[in-house]
Amino acid sequence: MTDGVRLATPRGRALLAATALGSGMAFLDSTVVNVALPTIGRELDASLAALQWTVNAYTLTLAALILLGGSLGDRLGRRRIYLVGVVWFTAASVLCALAPTAEVLIAARALQGIGGALLTPGALAILQTTMHPDDRPRAIGTWAGLTGVSGVLGPLLGGWLLEYDWRWVFAINVPLAVVTVWLIVVSAPESRDEQASGKFDVSGAALGAVALGASTYALISWPEDGASALNVGMAVLSVAAAAGFLYRERTAAHPMVPLSLFSDRTFSGINLMTFAVYAGLSGVMFFIVIQLQVTLGWSPLEAGIATIPTTILMLLFSGKSADLAKRFGIRPPLVVGSLCGAAGVVLLVAVGDGDNYLTDVLPGVTLLGIGLTTLVPTLTATVMASAPQHLAGVASGVNNGVARAAGLLAVAALPAIAGLSGAAYEDPELLTDAYRIAMGVCAGLLAVGAVAAMTLRPRALTEPPTTAPAAELHEHEAAAPAPCSAPGLPPSHGS
């Protein structure tokens, strides 16, 4: 199997299904809970801050540990760590389903994020190191599309499950995990980086986690408590920890994030774009389902169904969008996709003036779907093509950490920017005012993604990454518990 597994073979299809299904669970849980937030708030008597933490506790640990997941896979075996992640994620999902209070649910969501951090980078790294080179771009593009579909499908599935009980939103992961484990065992060979060496960068990981956690706390608490001593202290702590993290990664013998990885212009640019796009997308998915339910009075299922056009478009066409990048280069699909998505969000700003799905909601979600279908597969494939193959897990972990941290900070910051706090989200008029401000910001973030894409060096996906930084990267291979807050530090898809 020196040339890799062919996508057209039964084993290749099983491998793609196993990686898409497992990582899809993690992406699904990034969005499925959004549609359940109003119901969870009522049944567990949760404030807006508690609902934000229900989303962000998961994203926080996912972003904080996702680089560790990539490094562990590169060292101990990508299939092994992927399987551990699936099992851990499933066990935490059961705890979420049984949670009697908002506090217990938040804690279980944090545990769930740990499992997601182990399985998410492993899925992409398994494809990158196992698939035949000729099939790799298409396999990764299809994986990205299917994973994106799972994230967008979250509100629909969540709405349907809420017809029975919100706890099924988490319990549904159990049968999915059983299928995933079976598929990965029968289809994926074990792989690892035999040259990996060095100690885990525990200090770097701790500094990154503190930076992201402290900034998230300050952003969520500020609308209600203002410039309290605790909030100001957390803000200062986050800045100091972020500075300490960057210094540590520059000077450590074995950094968790080799900063020389960012010396590749494409890798740096695509991660900047990832941050902007996933921040915008996470904000859209957080606000749209609440707006549809609270302001328009739609049921959770109706709010979930509203996103179906986006799901259908990604399911039908994501597998082919990577072919566009091979033919025209990476910039056109990335720029066009970001601008289409931004235009779709602009149309969704008007939701609330009327409740006609065909005229008020459908145009926006359709245009957003076209943008994501064009953008996401090319973005993912570009990340992996711009890094040395033996650092596939680290590159995947960095990009996923950027995406998750972006979503984390967006969900924490947007309510504050829009002036929404406490129980104000239950007031349709106050919510609509905040919704429009937040969606305008999200559209702007997607437009920033297009600008970032324009700075990328034109290249086809078949071109190898520059080799200059590769040797240096190998010398400083990342192998530490992941940070969280590095990229400016934030997906999700869209997460």
Q: Could you say what each language-model-derived stretch is?
A:
Residues 1-11, 194, 456-495:
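Intrinsic disorder in cytosolic terminal tails and internal cytosolic loops
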Residues 14-35, 48, 203, 217, ...:
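12-transmembrane solute porter fold
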Residues 36-66, 104-108, 301-306:
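Extracellular/periplasmic helix-loop-helix junction of adjacent transmembrane segments
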Residues 40, 72, 160-161, 324, ...:
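Hydrophobic alpha-helical transmembrane and interfacial-helix anchor sites in secondary transporters
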Residues 43-45, 77, 98-104, 162-165, ...:
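Helix-breaking motifs and short loop linkers at transmembrane-helix boundaries and internal kinks
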Residues 56-70, 120-124, 308-320:
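Central cavity-lining transmembrane alpha-helices of secondary-active solute carriers
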Residues 71-203, 221, 389, 393, ...:
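Helix-loop-helix hairpins in multi-pass membrane proteins, especially solute transporters
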Residues 136, 174-193, 209-221, 237-252, ...:
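C-terminal membrane-cytosol helix-exit motif in multi-pass small-molecule transporters
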